[in-house]
């Protein structure tokens, strides 16, 4: 089980990316999915947070192929974009 400090660190890093668009995409993805992640998924997400926002957004939109180490269920879930909250 992850420590509270580890989850808070991931939450902060997911929601403070540098642009509002990346904050919504990456932060929204974290909020919607982190509760179901095991240790491997948390480590993969933490590694993904080291990547450039423009790359993560391109993977989510399907305009660029992610590195092989990120391919799989997490990227497929990222591509769904159903976790982004849009203000009305």
Question: Which residue stretches match the model-derived regions?
Answer:
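Positively charged, polar, low-complexity stretches
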Residues: 2-88
């Amino acid at each position: 089980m992850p420590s509270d400090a580890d989850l808070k660190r991931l939450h902060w890093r997911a929601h403070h990316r540098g642009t509002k668009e990346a904050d919504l995409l990456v932060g929204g993805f974290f909020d919607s999915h982190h509760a179901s992640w095991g240790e491997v998924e948390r480590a993969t997400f933490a590694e993904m947070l080291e990547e450039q926002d423009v790359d993560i957004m391109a993977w989510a939109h399907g305009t660029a192929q992610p590195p092989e180490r990120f391919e799989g269920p997490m990227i497929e879930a990222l591509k769904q974009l159903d976790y982004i909250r849009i203000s009305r």
